[in-house]
Amino acid sequence: MSAMTRTNTPAAPARATTIRRFLFRGERPCHRHPVENAGGSAARVRLRVLAAFLPVTAVLYVGAEALDPRGTDQVVISTAVALKLLPIAAAHSSQLYLSGSLSVLALGGLAVSYAAIAALVTGRGWVIATIAALLGGLGAFAGAMLNVLGGVNLAAAASGHMARGAAARFLVTSFGSVPSQVVEYVYFASEYAAPVVMGVALWRSRAVPRWLAVLFTAGLEVAGSMGAIGPKVVLFMLPFAVAMILLAARIWQAARPAPMTSKTPTSAAAAAPDTTTPLLTSPGS
């Protein structure tokens, strides 16, 4: 046999196999697939958009309550109450329109804010957070309908060209209808239940400090129970606004991309000497 002839062909080293996998299969160490990068970027952008709703909702909510004329937050259950509210509404009809519009926008933002806060709870308590988001969204929707009845309809009845008695009967009929009463019950039940349920979810999940969960629950409960007392309502709603801003910052931080590590495990085949490659022998062996 010739000295340059081998009895068998040595197998390719493991290093070459790794290189071929990188070149032909599209694999790269410490690199993510383009589809994964695009999906992660889209999710982060959506989460940050949701986070922006929290401070905007706080501003709208506080502004709506501050602009609400004094004494106009009553539920019209009789003609006497309607006749009492109509002169106040006639004197502040533009203010009522603005306050009612801001209330509808604030309640819509509150529904989105509940969904954004629930996105923070991904581990323990995520079921409770989901229930709280559903309750909050339902209550916000019912509250928007009730604010249209209470604010916008009151301003329309007061500024319209109709007799006081006819306007009072219109308001009593609107508030006394069965759909209006159902919406009212749903709103008041969800308004007080949703913050407590979400606070429990945040407390159990440890996604935020526990004092922030308490601040959110207490602040939103106080904000929802405030009446039309004028601009000083801002002081009572300040804890709610602070909690919403802090939660928005937490959601924004959660949307940051995870850091990538550059460490790649070294394969045992590449680290160990290749035992499958035969040794070259001299002609005399």
Residue positions per predicted region:
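Low-acidity, Ser/Thr- and Arg-rich intrinsically disordered low-complexity segments
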Residues: 2-6, 15
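Hydrophobic, aromatic-enriched alpha-helical segments typical of multi-pass transmembrane helices
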Residues: 6, 19-268, 274, 278-285
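N-terminal intrinsically disordered, low-complexity tails
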Residues: 12, 17-18
